[in-house]
């Protein structure tokens, strides 16, 4: 009997390679579909999989075919409708629609619906955050000297007794003994069967029985001489030290929850911060996040309170900036940490407080942060806070600001703020 062992990496998912090739080939169309789909999701359903539709025209392969028009001669088999020398009318032209529902009705032509397929959560998030990175991320070189961690790295045939893998060694022993004795055991079984037959036959065949018993004893001795365990079987757990990235990063999320922020505006701010959280947790292994909510007073909160607390009040934006400055001085040394901040507000602030916000950012925060992003969520005209921040944008390269009017603007603005650039790929 012949045995086939499937050692492919994707043995249980044999179409994985084709699927990955398809995702690479039609990445632009898939990303366009994803950017449209994310705006239709609820705030709590941003990170699941997605059904992606692609127009049929975008996935059609080029091919050679007969053009319309012209005169051609063909030979067709006869049937009960046509006989020799009949002239067949040319079918009416007209192509079908792509199935998107956009177009006019027609009695002619045919087409296909859009191609729809499901992508997994991992594929969805990979495409969602592709080409994004934290700007100006740098590594603290003096921390790289001792930044090594031990990781398991499979098995090796050499090692110290303390690292021996008993299970893997016994598996190898069983496999070796089975391979070395399988033929002898089959032969032994055949001889024992033959001896059993001869011993019950008439007349007795004593010489033949004696010969079979000698051969059986020799085979059993050979089988027993195969060692139970051999140095060839031994396997040891292998460990290796790998350098760990020494970059430490912290993201400050500052959200305005004042009375001027209606529920729709707060939902858009939360959607932006959920995208930011997923991006950080998906792209970077260890990034700390500090959540700050503010109205007239600012407070550092946990993740649940940041997204679900109903507390509200007036508006003094500088309270959040002062609290961030205090937390940085207390816990995050700029020489050891890459500090980032993302602030979301509707721009409504006490007029006398906006110049103070400018001063705190210019003198205390922007000199120590790698990147500070501000998004203003409003359909109204910009107020004093936006105008003060415009002066900062003209002065500091690590300050960026964007305007969000509707829910459809969130993802494009997010990509604009965190678009990967060659200058950001620090060594």
UniProtKB/Swiss-Prot annotation:
InterPro entries reported for this sequence: UPF0229
Task: Give the compositionally biased regions (Gly residues).
Answer: 92-102
Q: Which Pfam families match?
A: DUF444 (PF04285)
* Region called Disordered, residue ranges: 79-110
* Biased composition, class Basic and acidic residues, residue ranges: 79-90
Task: Family membership, please give it.
Answer: Belongs to the UPF0229 family.
Q: State the name under which the record lists this protein.
A: UPF0229 protein YeaH
Organism per entry: Salmonella paratyphi B (strain ATCC BAA-1250 / SPB7)
């Amino acid at each position: 009997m012949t045995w086939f062992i499937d050692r492919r990496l994707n043995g249980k998912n044999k179409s994985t390679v084709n699927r990955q090739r398809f995702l690479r080939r039609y990445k632009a169309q898939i990303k366009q579909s994803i950017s449209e789909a994310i705006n239709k999701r609820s705030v709590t359903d941003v990170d699941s999989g997605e059904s992606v539709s692609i127009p049929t025209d975008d996935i059609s392969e080029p091919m050679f075919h007969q053009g319309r028009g012209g005169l051609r001669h063909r030979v067709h088999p006869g049937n009960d409708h046509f006989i020799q020398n009949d002239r067949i009318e040319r079918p009416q032209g007209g192509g079908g629609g792509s199935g998107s529902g956009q177009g006019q009705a027609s009695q002619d032509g045919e087409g296909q619906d859009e191609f729809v397929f499901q992508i997994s959560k991992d594929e969805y998030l990979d495409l969602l955050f592709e080409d994004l990175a934290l700007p100006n991320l740098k590594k603290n070189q003096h921390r790289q000297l001792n930044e090594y961690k031990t990781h398991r790295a499979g098995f090796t045939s050499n090692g110290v007794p303390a690292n021996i893998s008993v299970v893997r060694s016994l598996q190898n022993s069983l496999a070796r003994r089975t391979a070395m004795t399988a033929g002898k055991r089959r032969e032994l079984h055949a001889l024992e069967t033959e001896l059993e037959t001869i011993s019950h036959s008439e007349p007795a065949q004593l010489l033949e029985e004696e010969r079979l018993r000698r051969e059986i004893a020799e085979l059993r001795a050979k089988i027993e001489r195969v060692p139970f365990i051999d140095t060839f079987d031994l396997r040891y757990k292998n460990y290796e030290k790998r350098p760990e990235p020494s970059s430490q990063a912290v993201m400050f999320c500052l959200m305005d929850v004042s009375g001027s922020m209606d529920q729709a505006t707060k939902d858009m701010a939360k959607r932006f911060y959920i995208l930011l959280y997923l991006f950080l947790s998906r792209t970077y292994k260890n990034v700390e996040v500090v959540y700050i909510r503010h109205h007239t007073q600012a407070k550092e909160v946990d993740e649940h309170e940041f997204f679900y607390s109903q507390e509200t009040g007036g508006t003094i934006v500088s309270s959040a900036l002062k609290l961030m400055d205090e937390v940085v001085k207390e816990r995050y040394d700029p020489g050891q940490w890459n500090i980032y901040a993302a602030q979301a507000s509707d721009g409504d602030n006490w007029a006398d407080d906006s110049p103070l916000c400018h001063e705190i950012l210019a003198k205390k925060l922007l000199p120590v942060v790698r990147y500070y992003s501000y998004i203003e969520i409003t359909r109204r005209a910009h107020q004093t806070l936006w105008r003060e921040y415009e002066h900062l944008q003209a002065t500091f390269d690590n300050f960026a600001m964007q305007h969000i009017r509707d829910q459809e603007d969130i993802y494009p603005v997010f990509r604009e703020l965190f678009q990967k650039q060659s200058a950001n790929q620090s060594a």
